[in-house]
Regions:
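Phosphate-binding loop of NTP-binding sites
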Residues: 1-110, 162, 166-169
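Adenine nucleotide phosphate-binding catalytic loops in nucleotide-utilizing enzymes
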Residues: 72-79, 91, 109-173
Length: 173
């Protein structure tokens, strides 16, 4: 996505590393590798279509926005780049269904949408914001999938966490 990549990558690295062990390379330069780990989490960027070099097993698209205006001519050019990236995914695309552009991708790959609106595959419900962070329940494909507490604030942090929860759900963790 254009925003939230580093946060989502760091969250996913933390979660998977605590469950099964994971290698990762985050956009801020943080990385870790262990030859025994099965998973590798990589933050990639849409700038100059650099992300088209990758063919991930899963891809997460947090959002699409007109960014890098020195390179992309308009939002349709950005959407075309994301479409090509997503179609390079080997297994499943996980995308924020609440984003105004992700549903325009018209992909050949299966897509699993996350968000807070009812038309997503995985949904945050009963959301409560407090001085301690965010408390919410998750419904995945119509079934209760757990209650979560995040020590973070804001809707975007909630959506980034839902992207990570979506990977865990799909991997049956």
């Amino acid at each position: 996505g254009c925003h939230g990549k580093t946060t989502t990558t760091a969250m996913l690295a933390h979660v998977l590393n605590s469950i099964v062990g994971a290698n990762y390379l985050i956009g801020d330069g943080t990385g870790y590798a262990n030859k025994d780990n099965e998973y590798f989490i990589l933050e990639s960027c849409e700038y100059k279509r650099h992300f088209l070099e990758y063919h991930p097993y899963y891809s997460i698209i947090t959002n699409i926005d007109l960014d890098h205006v020195d390179y992309y001519k308009d939002i349709d050019d950005v959407i075309d780049a994301y479409r090509e990236f997503a179609n390079n995914t080997e297994n499943l695309v996980i995308a924020c269904g609440d984003d105004q552009y992700t549903r325009f991708l018209d992909l050949t790959k299966p897509v699993f949408y996350y968000g807070i609106t009812e038309d997503n595959d995985i949904i945050a419900k009963e959301i409560e914001y407090s001085e301690n962070g965010i408390h919410f329940e998750v419904e995945a494909e119509g079934n209760y999938y757990g209650t979560y507490d995040l020590p973070f604030y804001g809707k975007h942090m909630l959506l980034d966490a839902l992207a990570c929860i979506s990977i865990c759900y799909y991997e049956r963790m």
